[in-house]
Amino acid sequence: MRIHLTSVLVDDQDKALHFYTEVLGFQKKTEVPLGEHRWLTVVAPEDPDGVELVLEPSDHPAVGPFRTALVTDGIPYTSFAVTNVQAETERLQALGVRFTQEPLAMGPVTTAVLDDTCGNLIMIASPVDPGPAGGAPA
């Protein structure tokens, strides 16, 4: 068994598709019309057959209170792996992305939290560089 799909709830699928592809760098994999919405997925360009992220419409009445509570408490909806959080934060800030948490080392990982403009906070994370001595002070 493996994870095939995961989703993020979005206010506007067109806006989300633009943000997740043109800003974050994912690529569109699937787009199937389903009435007023679409089955819309994106993937990492380096893993086009990997896990698909569904840009899921947030119309269900339970979604609003749930997402409001997460955002109010500063809790990310999901997390994406990056090679270097500091470099990725700088790249995204140059594109106008708003961060609610600047890069922060937390044990074995560095994280930062961004606003996806579609109603969610998203964490990016990378392993802390252990350095040449495995993390021991020089």
Go through each PLM region and give its residues:
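Short beta-strand segments
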Residues: 51-53, 122
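Short, P/G- and charge-enriched loop/turn segments at secondary-structure junctions
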Residues: 64-69
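Short, charged/polar surface micro-motifs in flexible loops or helix N-caps
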Residues: 45-50, 59-62, 85-87
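Eukaryotic phosphotyrosine signaling hubs
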Residues: 3-4, 73-77
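Core segments of cupin and vicinal oxygen chelate
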Residues: 8-51
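Helix N-cap motif at beta-to-alpha junctions
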Residues: 12-13, 83-85
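Vicinal oxygen chelate
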Residues: 5-8, 38-41, 80, 89-138
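Short amphipathic alpha-helices within nucleic acid-binding modules
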Residues: 19, 86-91
